[in-house]
Amino acid sequence: MHLIIPKDYDPKLSVKETQQAIRYIRETFQDEFGKQLNLSRLSAPMFVEKKTGLNDNLNGVEKPVSFTMQDMGDEQIEIVHSLAKWKRVALKRYGFDMHEGLYTNMNAIRKDEDLDNYHSAYVDQWDWEKVISKEERTVETLKAAVRQIFKVIKHMEHEVWYKFPQAVHHLPDEIHFLTTQELEDMYPDMTPRERENAICKKLGCVFLMQIGWKLDSGERHDGRAPDYDDWKLNGDILFWYEPLDQAIEISSMGIRVDAESMKKQLKDVDAEDRLSLPYHQMILNADVPYTIGGGIGQSRLCMLLLGKAHVGEVQAALWHKP
């Protein structure tokens, strides 16, 4: 666990005021977000059956919390890591049309998370997914969605300033786009995290694209599950965060895999055994729509807008006591 304690840190709001601000941000953001992207709110599962392949495998090494249920024999049930796969199936199941989408108030447990100022074993985010056409599986479609999300975040900055002027952390007015390879070329002697910090400190806000494949150096910028994002059409929204003097990731998102990209990515990480799972069969047989989607961290957004130094100030969870 790497903990940063900012010198002369002033949280601005009391605990009670912080809770009021959190409620305001969550309620206001999701309404505006849903309008901007044409999304309807859906209830979401806390757990899924392991055999469906619907859980998010993250980087492939994190193990989900699992259990059995009295009425289901030895069937393994898993607490979700995210709803990345479930959402795509839900769009088909609930009959969403072209350019319609959903968002959920997703709660997850990631017991193997490396804890720090931003990371908790408890994950709360708006998970969203939207139907697009095959022809819209492009970088421009991805960028357009990113700009819409950035617009909502900037809108929230002004809304929070109006309600809680003493707590606002000011955000940049523009988001910049670049790929992980471009970033490696700019800072070849830095680690991926150092590169993110360097570019965000320089530009303020960045959408860093194409995360998953190995770069020219032979290293990956970061790990990504091979069976939901297309690694050529994904990315992270990153802000420079002065209170901690480093970048903060607010959203990970992307255009989802089609059959071809999924097979290539599964082969790359030696996970082709997943192709037999129901979810993967639906993609191979084109039984689910083409989509774009992602997750927006609720607690991290509250941190960003309120200038908080630790995620524990905006959510209730557990951390090691130093």
Swiss-Prot record:
Pfam families named in the record: AsnA
Catalytic activity: L-aspartate + NH4(+) + ATP = L-asparagine + AMP + diphosphate + H(+)
Assigned EC number: 6.3.1.1
Single GO MF annotation: ATP binding
Coiled-coil zones: none
UniProt xrefs under Gene3D superfamilies: Bira Bifunctional Protein, Domain 2
Any one biological process term the GO annotation gives: L-asparagine biosynthetic process
Family: Belongs to the class-II aminoacyl-tRNA synthetase family. AsnA subfamily.
Protein name: Aspartate--ammonia ligase
Species: Lactiplantibacillus plantarum (strain ATCC BAA-793 / NCIMB 8826 / WCFS1)
